[in-house]
Structures are given as C-alpha cells and as structure tokens.
Amino acid sequence: SCMKAAPMKEVSIRGQGSLAYPGLRTQGNLETLSGPNDATRGLTSLADTFEHVIEELLDEQQVIQPSKENKDADLYSTRVMLSSQVPLEPPLLFLLEEYKNYLDAANMSMRVRRHSDPARRGELSVCDSTSEWVTAAEKKTAVDMSGATVTVLEKVPVPKGQLKQYFYETKCSSKGYAKEGCRGIDKRYWNSQCRTTQSFVRALTMDNKKRIGWRFIRIDTSC
C-alpha cells in the first residue's frame, strides 16, 4: 500500500502547543453513522468527537497561512517532524486516516463488518513493509528534485534553540516475500518483485556550494 503525505504546520490549539494538519479532509458524512441500536449510538458519539477534532484542525488553517514574515510556515510534511526527541508514534495524519476508515466501516451491519475485517478474512498485503522514524544523522545525504545530492542537516534552528529533523520512512521488509515476489501473484505465469518507492518531502538541507535552505528531497515512503 502507499502512504500519502499532506501539509503540516506547528500551531497552538486551544492554548497548547501541538501539530496540526490543515490539509486533512474527510470523506462521507459522519452523521450517517447514527442508527436505531445502542451500538450505533456509541459509534455516533465517536464520530462526533472525530468530526469536532477535524473542524478544529481546519479552523486553524485560517490562522497559520504563511505570510511574508514567516516564509517557512508551509515547509513541513507529515513524514518530517522537528522534535527534541524521537517521536513515539506514527504521524498523526496516518492515525486519523485509520480512525476515519474505522468510522466508515461502522456504518455497515455487524455481519458485514465481521466479514470485512482483514484479520477475519485472512487478508495480507501484497508486499510486507516496515516503517520507522530516522534521523538526518542516519540519512546523511539525499537526492533533491533537480537530481543533485544534498546534505541533510541534522538540526534546525528555532527561536528557543535547535530541534532535530526526523523522517518517517516506509520500506519493503527484508523478510518474507521481498525477494520471492509479490504475495498473491501466480509465479508460474508472472515475475514480480516488491520494491521500495520514494516520494518528495520538504527538509532543511545544504548543497555542494554550502547553501542552506528548504528543499524537496526523496525518502522511502512505501513498498
């Protein structure tokens, strides 16, 4: 499967520092989750909570539009995080998407949901993948949009000091079907191979002329 990134900004939500994702949009109508039984009512309350969070994130978009004084306001993505320590969880946007998919499934009957559960049907992905946060010190260099190799800076200066750049990378697992071909493909008739694919994200880098700036670089994002 392929993970998508969306713009991310660091903002303050209700007086607390947090990471907001104004690019997030929901699909479908969460109000359709309401139903006659108690189980559905419980899911409706979860849907209302999720919808409220999304509305807050969308409201913040009006506050954090980039201005002339803040040229770097729109330079973050969900796969790049500036932090003083290693993030303990995957990017928030991915968690929100998984939760939204759960709510969408909640609109089906219990029987349909039971049969649609991948764990119950024995569903497996075509290619196995692993995801983890890596530092600029581990990446060292990357390729930008022009094809040039640039140095990925480990630390980013901020008003109160420095923060490290972390990248959430997804790549094909070295175990399982990575070398034997894609799962579910008939090897008698087809040749297949699981390959790690890359996408561009914005990061603070330095080119071979020692010029420092925000550039789009390639990182591993799916298998």
UniProtKB/Swiss-Prot annotation:
Cellular compartments annotated: Secreted
Q: Does the keyword Signal apply?
A: yes
Q: Which GO terms describe its molecular function?
A: growth factor activity; nerve growth factor receptor binding
Q: Which residues form the propeptide?
A: 6-114
Q: Which UniProt keywords apply?
A: Cleavage on pair of basic residues, Disulfide bond, Glycoprotein, Growth factor, Secreted, Signal
Supply the PANTHER family for this chain: BRAIN-DERIVED NEUROTROPHIC FACTOR, NERVE GROWTH FACTOR NGF -RELATED
Q: What is this protein called?
A: Neurotrophic factor BDNF precursor form
